[in-house]
Amino acid sequence: MRSFNSFRQESCSDATSSSGRIRTKSKSLSVVSLFISGVLLAPVSMAADEAKPATDATKSANQALMKELPFDDKTGFELAHKGFIAPLPQEQIKGEQGNLVWDPAKYGFIKEDQAAPDTVNPSLWRQSQLINISGLFQVTDGIYQVRNQDLSNMTIVEGKEGITIFDPLISTETAKVALDLYFQHRPKKPVVAVIYTHSHVDHYGGVRGVVDEADVKSGKVKIYAPVGFMEAAVAENVMAGTAMSRRASYMYGNLLPPSATGQVGAGLGTTTSAGTVTLIPPTDIITKTGETKVIDGLTYEFMYAPGSEAPSEMLFYIKEKKAINTAEDSTHTLHNTYSLRGAKIRDPLAWSKYLNEAIHMWGDDADVMFAMHHWPVWGKGEIVKHLKSQRDLYRFINDETLRMANQGKTMVEIAEDFKLPDALNTYFSNRGYYGSINHNVKATYVLYLGWFIGNPATLHTLPPVDAAKRYVDMMGGTDALLKKAKEYYDKGEYRWVAEVVNHAVFADPSNQAAKNMQADALEQLGYQAESGPWRNFYLTGAKELREGVNKLPVPDTASPDTVKAMSLELFFDYLAMRLDSEKADGKKIVLNFDFTDQKEKYLLEMENGVLNHTLGAEDKEANASVSLARTTLDALMLKQVTLEDALEKGDIKITGDQEKLTELLSYLDNFDFWFNIVTP
């Protein structure tokens, strides 16, 4: 899963020069971090009477899937139950402030022996049943997993002197409870190592719940990660953080109640915890495939897999245990080569080649394969079969998309016509519970050919509102459009209704009748969706069409670890992205920055509505020079000190025209998290 951080920095303004100090309207330079999809947002329930039942068309579509897939195959359930030791504690997990972090009973309505409701795709329901097989499990001798204590699994390996933990979940609170559960059933040995398999927050955020940083600094605990981990963990989504976070509140269904007409999980796991996110930098970096490390008496061979499921990722094999850890590159779902929250597109061809490499490196020797989501696979033959199937799945997406593109088909046409070979299509672990064939194919097209399909009619289309008004006019007005759309709705053509009625909504967002019809269509599409994120997008869209956007408080909970890990280069890039070019047009500001504790200097130049920075440069004619320690910058971003106080204490020294710093900050844009998605 994908981690992300959105930072919002409050601008400072209204300087007064008489005192020679900068006075600020906002009392601090603040940063807000939102990790994966509004994890910190408490779910808001829809009123029970707003969710409508499944229509006959939806029931029929879901029943048809029952005939397409081998639902009588119970292998997945046997694997998910294997090695069970103890259930999860059923008490709610709360943070220091009494905030709800994790509710293990939240998805209790999903029963293993219960048929899918009419309002849930039966294949997604099956996946959610499997994910909800929770607790502490033995993978093999000396390897244990805690599953469904968060979005991801936490793995514990017993070594010579202590234990090694793989991927300590999202939050310190959930990670601590997971470790406590393990200790209730196994000897209480010290944690001697942590392995981060990749750079997404559900694989490192709870680290301070299982180890003390003092032990890391003293050398008692080592932390292993792939090269580029820190850069990717902090930077992957900073620049588009607000947009990604808002869209991810749709993707993970954070605004939906868990229910048969609401959220049933994300396909990769149930949902995200809402606790304290931390990050301790790794002590040991894995740089290449074939690199080996002896960790607490066990031999690990690593495969470096950058640009697969994450920018920085690694798989590995534990020789003495004959165990492959595939990180998140091979689980029990088709993963995302593009995340609907928004992200850079991942390369399915490279992904396929990494899995092929894993087969040839370890397939002849492994007795068990496990990942950081879902349940393991046991037995050489079954492991190789699974890896080959997923290898071929990603390779087929790449190759078939390009084959059809070279026939002249467009992105949407390819996604519509795309068919997997039957052996790949009917293997449950290849189904699109998290990713989907449709949106992964579209992503692959864009990866190679970009957004333009080649038809000049689509080269410079009107923006949504302008186009919508003209569509409605050409269709004879909103009433005529809705009347005709209702006929299509009654025939079960919900995709077409959603496409057409969207024009009515964007032409006149005050028309509740149009929004209600659009919501009804999206809701039925959600009930039919096999992908958890698709279902969540559809149902959240329906909710906001009916109710409007509920602007919940966005908590100011910047993670100190993440802020401290943010490079100065990234910090200045982020400031530049926030520059409001209209406000800054025609203005010129030049500032020298000297970070005394890091012995780094930066030159900031604002001109032409752009903010550039240069490491190691200095301008003697600059408007002002600013001197401070990096620790002071961190304290400002975390709101531990105000800009005015830092100036008064001498933690920040400014020579030259002090008001120019305030002027620059006044040009920085602030972003509203709750921007509209399903309305203009």
Question: For each of these PLM feature ranges, what is it?
Answer:
Residues 12, 47, 493-499, 506, ...:
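Feature captures hydrophobic
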